[in-house]
Amino acid sequence: MKIVIDSNRVIAALIQDSTTRQILFDKNFEFFAPEYIKGEIDKYRKDIIEKANIKEEEFEVLLSLIFEHITIISKNEYQDILNDLGNIIKDTKDIAYFAVCIFVKADGIWTHDLHFKEQKRFKIFMNIDMLWFSRNTNSDI
């Protein structure tokens, strides 16, 4: 199953060994993200390290492991799609996630940002949905 992952799910996986991290390492999913996700993570680096109560080196190792499971899509690859999406949601920086969803023909976007649900064109998944898909891999979305 192809899933575009929002930065809030990566941050959650970095902060705590939780359901989010288990989903991220689940082989039933193929994760994609726009390249700007790395900047988003870096912007909150100090907060993540503090909340996770880990050292910088541990953060780097964990981040590296997580990004082994995410294919980063360059803005050059989805640039043309951005123009077609217009203002699909209020937070325009998040439009890149929708563009990547189209570009890779993903099944949906995994996020806990509720404003993603303001639009009806793309499927938005939360942890509970991802857990269900993981346990029912042969089912339709």
Give the label of every model feature segment.
Residues 1-33:
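Short, well-structured N-terminal submotif of metal-dependent ribonuclease cores
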Residues 71-108, 114:
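Active-site neighborhoods of divalent-metal-dependent phosphate/nucleic-acid chemistry enzymes
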Residues 31, 52, 124-128:
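Short hydrophobic/aromatic-enriched beta-strand-loop microsegments
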Residues 17-20, 25, 45-47, 123-126:
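Short, glycine/charged-enriched secondary-structure capping and boundary segments
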Residues 10, 37, 97, 115-116:
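Alpha-helix capping/helix-boundary segments
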Residues 102-141:
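Acidic, PIN/NYN-like endoribonuclease modules and their adjacent C-terminal/linker elements
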Residues 13-14, 40, 44, 119:
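Residues that scaffold the ATP/ADP-binding catalytic core of kinase and kinase-like folds
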Residues 26-28, 35-84:
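PIN-domain endoribonuclease scaffold, especially VapC-family toxins
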